[in-house]
Regions:
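Rossmann-like NAD(P) dinucleotide-binding subdomain of oxidoreductase/dehydrogenase enzymes
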Residues: 2-98
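ALDH superfamily catalytic-core signature
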Residues: 54, 62-172
Length: 172
């Protein structure tokens, strides 16, 4: 069978731990799903030494390039999902409530810090005012707080660089 070695982003240590807990609680043996805490250089070194039969990387373009370079010497197959930050589209025939719920959740999930997050939304002009009004109401209802508390909707940014990027986007 296949095994999984999860090396998560250094800013998201709890995510890997929670996934490991869930898989192990479901009966997956420890040696089949492993959560590892590695820096970028160590990760690249392990891939370069062909420690894995396949690498699936989700993250930045720079990180993806590093994984491809590390794997190139051993011809280890690599699949990458890079950059992220997808657009959302609201057509004239859309259900505005459903569009707001789906797109705002997609934008705000994980405080907007996921590579599949909705970064920009294009709304048909006939629905624009209603969409914006409902989106503002949706955002205002979010509870900011400690991410370890179950009633928190949005916690802090993972690092200073992410916070600066969001501030810049807001100021635009």
């Amino acid at each position: 069978g296949n095994t999984v070695v999860l090396k998560h982003a250094t800013q998201t240590l709890q995510v890997g731990e929670r996934l490991a807990e869930a898989f192990h609680a479901a009966g997956i043996p420890d040696d089949v799903f492993q959560n590892v805490f590695l820096d970028h250089d160590t990760t690249s070194a392990l891939i370069a030494e062909r420690q894995f039969g396949f690498v699936n990387f989700t993250g930045s373009v720079g990180g993806g390039k590093a994984m491809e370079v590390a794997a190139a010497g051993t011809f280890t197959p690599v699949a990458t999902e890079l950059g992220g930050k997808d657009p959302g589209y609201v057509r004239a025939d859309a259900d505005v409530d459903a569009a707001v719920d789906g797109l705002m959740d997609g934008a705000m999930f994980n405080a907007g810090q996921c590579c599949c997050g909705i970064e920009r939304i294009y709304v048909h002009e006939s629905l624009y005012d209603a969409f914006v009004e409902k989106a503002v109401t949706w955002v205002n209802a979010l509870k900011l707080g400690n991410p370890l508390e179950t009633d928190t909707d949005i916690g802090p940014m993972a690092n200073v660089r992410f916070a600066a990027e969001v501030r810049a986007q807001i100021s635009e």
